[in-house]
Amino acid sequence: EPVPEGRGELAVAIREFCYPQTTHPALENVNFQLKPGQMLGICGPTGAGKSTVLSLIQRHFDITHGDVRFHDIPLTRLQLDSWRSRLAVVSQTPFLFSDTVGNNIALGRPQATQEEIEHVARLASVHEDILRLPQGYDTEVGERGVMLSGGQKQRISIARALLLNAEILILDDALSAVDGRTEHQILHNLRQWGEGRTVIISAHRLSALTEASEIIVMQHGHIAQRGEHESLVQQPGWYRDMYRYQQLEAALSDAPEINEEAANA
């Protein structure tokens, strides 16, 4: 059946999920609900099940034990293309075509106006970068976007996803090549853009999750910790350890210039 009109709650209740031809569960007891306007953060070590959760929401596989529901209807009962048209997904390695920057952003909505294209580019903090290119939005990006940095490519694909105006935005480690300050700006913009929309962010860098209404920490295919950023940084566990480590790493990577200046003084 077609997906009902209007914004609805996304409810994930996975009792167990095994990939085809495997017996070891990739996920066990993963449950969460997301109302329109909420932002969910997903984190955890590599291989913990983050990508599996995201692929089940996109219905790349069907679940036999449990279900994912939208508007309280299991995804298996919804038309697949109708469901996927409600999602905008940005992966870690975005795909750009050998075309202009503007056409790359308008990929999912070729009829979009220049004004709409620039609006989403601003939300994705990439508008200023584009204006610095030789022909601005009409600059050809070359094969697979070779002219652009990794962070610029990620931001262009975030702009492309925002232009789709989908109800559910999924960022799968899609800010990994973006610097901390820009990441902060994009997340702030997403909060405002996302009023009434559902945003799911999976990330290795935990600073990307501080705005989330709930964060789930995946380990070995299940939810090891959950809560808001402020409460998780105060609980002993993977999240607090990793957050402290990343804060330290960020502070150290900002420091070397000072030492060089002192050495040259």
Task: Locate the predicted segments by residue.
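ABC-type nucleotide-binding domain
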Residues: 3-265
